[in-house]
Amino acid sequence: MSESEGGKDTTPEPSPANGAGPGPEWGLCPGPPAVEGESSGASGLGTPKRRNQHSKHKTVAVASAQRSPRALFCLTLANPLRRSCISIVEWKPFDILILLTIFANCVALGVYIPFPEDDSNTANHNLEQVEYVFLVIFTVETVLKIVAYGLVLHPSAYIRNGWNLLDFIIVVVGLFSVLLEQGPGRPGDAPHTGGKPGGFDVKALRAFRVLRPLRLVSGVPSLHIVLNSIMKALVPLLHIALLVLFVIIIYAIIGLELFLGRMHKTCYFLGSDMEAEEDPSPCASSGSGRACTLNQTECRGRWPGPNGGITNFDNFFFAMLTVFQCVTMEGWTDVLYWMQDAMGYELPWVYFVSLVIFGSFFVLNLVLGVLSGEFSKEREKAKARGDFQKQREKQQMEEDLRGYLDWITQAEELDMEDPSADDNLGSMAEEGRAGHRPQLAELTNRRRGRLRWFSHSTRSTHSTSSHASLPASDTGSMTETQGDEDEEEGALASCTRCLNKIMKTRVCRRLRRANRVLRARCRRAVKSNACYWAVLLLVFLNTLTIASEHHGQPVWLTQIQEYANKVLLCLFTVEMLLKLYGLGPSAYVSSFFNRFDCFVVCGGILETTLVEVGAMQPLGISVLRCVRLLRIFKVTRHWASLSNLVASLLNSMKSIASLLLLLFLFIIIFSLLGMQLFGGKFNFDQTHTKRSTFDTFPQALLTVFQILTGEDWNVVMYDGIMAYGGPFFPGMLVCIYFIILFICGNYILLNVFLAIAVDNLASGDAGTAKDKGGEKSNEKDLPQENEGLVPGVEKEEEEGARREGADMEEEEEEEEEEEEEEEEEGAGGVELLQEVVPKEKVVPIPEGSAFFCLSQTNPLRKGCHTLIHHHVFTNLILVFIILSSVSLAAEDPIRAHSFRNHILGYFDYAFTSIFTVEILLKMTVFGAFLHRGSFCRSWFNMLDLLVVSVSLISFGIHSSAISVVKILRVLRVLRPLRAINRAKGLKHVVQCVFVAIRTIGNIMIVTTLLQFMFACIGVQLFKGKFYTCTDEAKHTPQECKGSFLVYPDGDVSRPLVRERLWVNSDFNFDNVLSAMMALFTVSTFEGWPALLYKAIDAYAEDHGPIYNYRVEISVFFIVYIIIIAFFMMNIFVGFVIITFRAQGEQEYQNCELDKNQRQCVEYALKAQPLRRYIPKNPHQYRVWATVNSAAFEYLMFLLILLNTVALAMQHYEQTAPFNYAMDILNMVFTGLFTIEMVLKIIAFKPKHYFTDAWNTFDALIVVGSIVDIAVTEVNNGGHLGESSEDSSRISITFFRLFRVMRLVKLLSKGEGIRTLLWTFIKSFQALPYVALLIAMIFFIYAVIGMQMFGKVALQDGTQINRNNNFQTFPQAVLLLFRCATGEAWQEIMLASLPGNRCDPESDFGPGEEFTCGSNFAIAYFISFFMLCAFLIINLFVAVIMDNFDYLTRDWSILGPHHLDEFKRIWSEYDPGAKGRIKHLDVVALLRRIQPPLGFGKLCPHRVACKRLVAMNMPLNSDGTVTFNATLFALVRTSLKIKTEGNLEQANQELRIVIKKIWKRMKQKLLDEVIPPPDEEEVTVGKFYATFLIQDYFRKFRRRKEKGLLGNDAAPSTSSALQAGLRSLQDLGPEMRQALTCDTEEEEEEGQEGVEEEDEKDLETNKATMVSQPSARRGSGISVSLPVGDRLPDSLSFGPSDDDRGTPTSSQPSVPQAGSNTHRRGSGALIFTIPEEGNSQPKGTKGQNKQDEDEEVPDRLSYLDEQAGTPPCSVLLPPHRAQRYMDGHLVPRRRLLPPTPAGRKPSFTIQCLQRQGSCEDLPIPGTYHRGRNSGPNRAQGSWATPPQRGRLLYAPLLLVEEGAAGEGYLGRSSGPLRTFTCLHVPGTHSDPSHGKRGSADSLVEAVLISEGLGLFARDPRFVALAKQEIADACRLTLDEMDNAASDLLAQGTSSLYSDEESILSRFDEEDLGDEMACVHAL
């Protein structure tokens, strides 16, 4: 219920919903309304309840405010019908009723049993009648709501709400189905088979009614988080969905090309249509596929294909379905094996393995990345919201309390008139009036005190004491209650008196004391460590007794277990009673473990008594015995890290509970839908019953849950398709249901589990880290610190435990630190792998002698040292390691004595001797093991030594019979591990994995304990019950004898005889170990449905299964899967991911840039501009323009899409004309793409064409396609007689792929996809070492597998067969890859166990035929699965989540993936990749790049200029900026890297940081991106700041003028002057705001208006430039400066006659009185920057040449001949055509005055940022002044902020030499003053400034008072302002001076203090040139 944000007024208007206003009790005074059912006597305690009521009323009121005035065009709000509807709809019970109806409806749908063939029964018929009732209720609800809210037009109308719309559709569909049912029935229908009208199944639509429970979601806040994060993630998930779809489409089309029609041949008996095999698979009539080996069989076509013809590549849709199935990693190996049978081994494995790696490992892991990112974001938001809510509730309580107290006081005042009022009330009222209001806490405490009814004494004291202070109403209510209780109290009092007397006797006192002592002792005993360990020992014994149970155990063991159970139960009961007595009930109950103990003990007692009495079987509750095992978790008390983990698990339980609710709703909805679609339809195969069906509601739930876990979901889908008539049109649509269910359930919901786990662990991890820090710093405070964490009961022991834990942890940490010091600097995780691996440091010879005889200086030792560190030596050893590994893989596992093995044996001798020599050399250098730094002190060296010694020993023992030798031979496999020590990056990954394993330890313990507990429960439930007879008709071992007949496929003509055997299930629960094994396979989701159905059918020990005997037992498996597989395994995975992340972030800890900043800066430093070729030749240029045009791009895009469609149209058995058409189309497309290639080659010339990777790719495809056509034509022409398949084999398989590859070009088009691809490639760069580690693990396991299981015979029908075996190295690797994807790995494990048939070619002895395989298989496969599934695959996930965090990050944060765009667009401005562009183009460039990097198209030009002010890129002497500097400045400002504080200092710090991270960085590049302080030149930022200030001045001039010119002439000069000064004062804040670059608050003028005014400005005011004296003229290069508002093209900057005629003053700063010269801004300012080393006067010749190169359009020169201004060019931007297509506007350029020759221009700038401003981007810091500025000048002085609370941007100063002589660069005599109070300086006589009047002083004073002191110090500015005021007031300057003197004489001077002159000559000079950019005003 959301409270309305605002008002404190908690008394709403009465609304139709609550009906009542203030009740009668509150009649006396205004107050809170009475709520129904609440008595008038309620006190302040009622506030929370009442507050909720208020909030409800508020919402209702708000809602009514938003209601549509009319509903259905006729019902107004006053209409009684509508009012009654509204009150019904908003009545709470109505909501509850509807929800109950929804539940009832779900139940009805669930109870309904669908029958095959639309059959039915009475129950179903009755349920269909009930449907009508539901329909009526829902229809009524809908109608009422429509009447109440209106239908659709108003925003708050009924259908506008999503949930309502859903309801509406469901109701309409329901009514529609009823109408259809009433239609004429089909002949022959039974009267009660409803639901199938007109042949259309409306029940399927009815099932949508089941979506209604989703309305519950709005009631549970934690569900909101889950749903919100899923909803939020949908947008990035859509991107990924597109990528997945793209992968699927490409693979589907490749599949069509390669595998079209390959699945339709199988082995038939000669001359008949009978399939030769029971389980047929494809074959090949020729080539390298599977041949039919049985006699009388042949390979031929017309077989529908595997899975009834559903799995194939016969057309595009089948291909997509098959590819999707492979991407989900279910059943992909079957498809692969069928393809290998049909085609041979060359191509299929490449196709399928690459598909699984890309589609599953990479793309689908992105889903996880996105979800976990979104989830953590959402959780943070929710947390923030929660905190805010609590804060608000607290405020609300206080407010309510205040309201109540005021109201009580008022009531008392009214009561005062009543003489009979109690004295207490009077005093209370006084207290209230005196302001002694009780606080909320006080009131609640008193209330609590009064409720202690069991303590009479406390009550009496409270009743007396509280009367004085409680509010009157409270006291009233108390007296009432006391009145009621008086009678009882009489009796109570007498009892109490008796009791008191008895208690005071001596005996009782002694007893009490004894009791107290005994309790204290008990408490101490219970809390002692001895007791703790004793209990743990008991738990351990209990565990042992339970774990020792197994099937077929001897009688004595059973008896022992029974006795042990009873004894242990007694002991646990004693412990419980002792605790209860010692601690007291309340303290006992407060601990969670105690409550749990109590529950278990009571359960045990109950179970034992029931069994003894014989009331029940000794089974059901014996499960409770197993629950006792949970007591093991008591260990956590002494194990800090484990208890942290358990805490964080319990923490995530909360989030997971809400997720489970969502999951449950999801499963119910899909189960009901499944029942409607498939109920009773899975009976198409009569020969065997399907178990995963939708025939009843529980069964449907199980099936949906199975699909959710992804196990064999494809099999259920095949059944669904076959139920609807097989792989033809309508039946195939069924797959949509399964695909949606699988995607939503498995990918989204189950990944949210993992996301929650990762998120909670990450936050828990942070907590633990903090705790560790805390523990280290204040161990003394441990007791106090931990009091809050522990229940009061167990404080002392907890403290002890924690102290110990802390000490242990400290020791561990110290050890870790030592280890880390030994390792080379920091184990960087996944991230570091990208870094260039630095050269290994040469380890010096350690001190001490080697072999006791070679000293440190021994020449032999030195020589060896040089040798082993020589790079040739190390590389050679690496090569030998690789070669020896290859030789291992090449061995023949079957025939040990084959020729190949002999040769490899000799190689082995060679390698071993080389490695032995290496080790001896190293021992010579480092010594063996006695001293520090010696050879054997390193783990990796020990590994080397082990591997070599194993090889040496195995040479010594020759007899291969000894199993030791076999083991030693297997150990040679560890050789590749020696490479780890050689490759630095690999070492990092391995260290990372070890850290992960160490961290995972705790989780392993918790998971194993839980697994063990479930295994014990499983043993109790299922031991000995999984036995079956091979003949299903027999149920006991006694019956199961002899043989029986089998009819395959129900064919009576072919009976087979089989023997009856009594067999156990492969996975069973006969003992705890088997149970753990079985449960482990369940937790990997492999084969668990089979186990589940066995458990459901299990009946009793030594009795066969009974179909669906106990369906409820499935709860055991579901709970196990949720707790272990969903939750614990995901936490496991989450931990790995977090560990890798933490390892990766370690390297960012020491430097000041975070990961994202670092990546962006690295990109900016390393990026190079792209070259863009622009041809000179006009014809070539035309082609180039065409090829580069957008239209051409779109045309090619369209062609590729059409090509894709054409490729996708192929299908199996297509007609000859269709074939011909496809060939023609292929040629057409190839021709078109060839033309594209030729055009591009003409446009770019081959050299430039092939530099772009995409072009090279295109060329390859075109050439391949042409070859493809040629080969096809030749084949078809030459071999018409032959079968086309084999002749065109080469072309079909290989060259056809080129057609498909064109699709990949689409990827280069879309923006989002491009970014995804970019990140993919980044991930791949981060993966090489991870991939290397995976390859090593695969290699080692493959070689071990070959040695151990290579001899097992290949038998069809088993898991070790022709497609899946260990006989060759590639086969072994493929088999392991299959296990890594989890495809039935447990079956391969079973097939490798001992007792399997040996391969006939292997060398086994007589009688050893069935001895192949090994028990080692269990350890082998489980360890491999754990390593792969949990560690290795998660390395992928970790890397991907690392690189894709931008998908979920706030898009407005700049990331490295944004920066490619900059390169692309820069190349348009700098086609030659010179790395520099005109600084004017920077604005245009940045407006073309979208935020966050650029400004975006919508950014106004002037705002863009403002943002450039913050960029500190150096401006070169030719007016250009460089590529890296621009990109770096963008990154720096966007990510706020060192932008605060003093800029010089920040720059210095940043330079240090960059040097520290990128040690090999070139100094030149560093100086380019961060100019060093001593060379600071003009930067773009300063340049644009100059322009902005000048522009502001012009604007404010115009505004002021508008304001002042309207007035009539002032009556007196003095008052006119005062008005002028006042207006100047008004202007102050505006000026300050302008200077803070505050764009937001500026008043917006219409752009058109501004332009018109500009036009008028130029036409009416013939003002010219103020010329500088000729001494200032020098060589210069003109740089144009953009202005925000633009001029029409028609306006020329050319000089007019009037301009030429206007005389200009030789005095630069004092305007002529009365002249119009300085009235308004003229056309341009000149700002020239000298070219270095070029002092001759120069025009724009060089510039023009460069401009021509850049193809700059027209230019206008603006010459003022008389004034002698140097020529200056106004440049229009080269991209004008692109940028201003719509408007006829070009930016007006302003140019600044020239700088004298021979010196660099240098700005002095001070920028003071306004506080609290985030949107402004000021340039911080004090900038460097020119080289000539004095060393003693106080640089920081201007930084003193003005006292107005708002800082200002000081304008920029262009310091120049020239006419004013040395004055402008003179030394400052003292620090510059900021403004203080208003004071007028004395007259200042300065020869260079002519006469100054009193008016100047007044203007200065006003400026200073307004915080514009910096302007006041500039005499030219003051003169200008004075001139402005004079013009505005229509005074001459002399009149103005006189008026000023009069004002001062009249005593205004008392306002000013005359202490000292503000303008000293030096200050003035320093500030004088401020107007360099503004003096044209």
Curated annotation (Swiss-Prot):
Entry keyword Nuclease: no
Composition skew (Basic and acidic residues), residue ranges: 1-11, 768-783
Annotated region (Dihydropyridine binding), positions in chain: 1060-1150, 1397-1463
Cross-referenced SMART domains: Ca_chan_IQ (SM01062)
Region Phenylalkylamine binding, residue ranges: 1409-1452
Keyword Transcription: no
II repeat start-end pairs: 515-761
Tissue-level expression: Expression in skeletal muscle and retina. Isoform 4 is expressed in retina.
Domain of life per record: Eukaryota
Effect of V635I: In CSNB2A; uncertain significance
MF terms in GO: high voltage-gated calcium channel activity; metal ion binding; voltage-gated calcium channel activity
IV repeats: 1177-1444
Composition-biased stretches (Polar residues): 1661-1670, 1702-1716, 1733-1743, 1829-1840
Chain positions of III repeats: 858-1140
Compositional bias (Low complexity): 455-469
Residue ranges of I repeats: 79-375
Residues the record marks as carrying a glycan: N295
Subunit-level organization: Voltage-dependent calcium channels are multisubunit complexes, consisting of alpha-1, alpha-2, beta and delta subunits in a 1:1:1:1 ratio. The channel activity is directed by the pore-forming and voltage-sensitive alpha-1 subunit. In many cases, this subunit is sufficient to generate voltage-sensitive calcium channel activity. The auxiliary subunits beta and alpha-2/delta linked by a disulfide bridge regulate the channel activity. Interacts (via IQ domain) with CABP4; in a calcium independent manner.
Recorded disease: Night blindness, congenital stationary, 2A: A non-progressive retinal disorder characterized by impaired night vision, often associated with nystagmus and myopia. Cone-rod dystrophy, X-linked 3: An inherited retinal dystrophy characterized by retinal pigment deposits visible on fundus examination, predominantly in the macular region, and initial loss of cone photoreceptors followed by rod degeneration. This leads to decreased visual acuity and sensitivity in the central visual field, followed by loss of peripheral vision. Severe loss of vision occurs earlier than in retinitis pigmentosa, due to cone photoreceptors degenerating at a higher rate than rod photoreceptors.
Similarity comment: Belongs to the calcium channel alpha-1 subunit (TC 1.A.1.11) family. CACNA1F subfamily.
Domain notes: Each of the four internal repeats contains five hydrophobic transmembrane segments (S1, S2, S3, S5, S6) and one positively charged transmembrane segment (S4). S4 segments probably represent the voltage-sensor and are characterized by a series of positively charged amino acids at every third position.
Protein name listed in UniProt: Voltage-dependent L-type calcium channel subunit alpha-1F
